Amino acid sequence: MTGRGKGGKVLSLGGKGGKGAKRHRKVLRDNIQGITKPAIRRLARRGGVKRISGLIYEETRGVLKVFLENVIRDSVTYTEHARRKTVTAMDVVYALKRQGRTLYGFGG
């Protein structure tokens, strides 16, 4: 890695050992459905909820998606400002703090 500076990776375009162009593109499904009904039910139980309406599950997924989009957007902003390509735990901690949700136990 001498002489290339920071972040100077060499890209190979096929051949032995290198990855060529991908033949198939991965289909992005709606990953929010990965937050299952039992997972939402467990979170509600932890919060002291006894009975849950059937309409709650989709609403919870929507709210969680918006929340995570905001936190991830702020985290990536911190990462880009520091000229890094890896989002650190501290980026997420600072993003949460910016939104008024201070998180303890992850440094800082």
Swiss-Prot record:
GO terms for cellular component: nucleosome; nucleus. It is found in: Nucleus; Chromosome. Keywords: Chromosome, DNA-binding, Nucleosome core, Nucleus. GO terms for molecular function: DNA binding; protein heterodimerization activity; structural constituent of chromatin. SMART domains: H4 (SM00417). Residues 1-24 are annotated as: Disordered. PROSITE patterns: HISTONE_H4. CDD domains: HFD_H4. Core component of nucleosome. Nucleosomes wrap and compact DNA into chromatin, limiting DNA accessibility to the cellular machineries which require DNA as a template. Histones thereby play a central role in transcription regulation, DNA repair, DNA replication and chromosomal stability. DNA accessibility is regulated via a complex set of post-translational modifications of histones, also called histone code, and nucleosome remodeling. Belongs to the histone H4 family. This is Histone H4. It comes from Mastigamoeba balamuthi (Phreatamoeba balamuthi).
